[in-house]
């Protein structure tokens, strides 16, 4: 799922275990949109040259090389699921503080209905 949030291109997906992932929506090699690529296991494979990234944005495979270049990857954005909402932090990851998120306990009440989707 591709979204532009606060001017940043982000690709969102879920791992096989259902964990939500948010990564920068571009391959580190040629900036090909990873949202136009494919998921394999818990990672994403660039549709241009096949670079494979894990769910943390680390480059874990390059088809044309035996070893991956060190320090190459894409930005991983911290996120948190609370009820039916997914909160993403686009700033400095060291400053992400889940305690600052607004509390919305009624969103999880059994008699409460929520509309889902992108608004």
Question: Model regions: which residues?
Answer:
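Rieske [2Fe-2S] iron-sulfur-binding subdomain
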Residues: 1-20, 40-41, 52-119
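Short, solvent-exposed loop/edge-beta patches enriched in aromatic
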Residues: 15-16, 28-30
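A glycine-rich beta-to-alpha transition motif near the start of alpha/beta enzyme domains, typified by
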Residues: 24
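Short cysteine-rich clusters marking metal-coordination/redox-active sites
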Residues: 27, 46
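Detector for the c-type heme attachment site
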Residues: 30, 50-52
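Conserved HGGG/HGGXW glycine-rich cap/lid loop of the alpha/beta-hydrolase fold
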Residues: 31-36
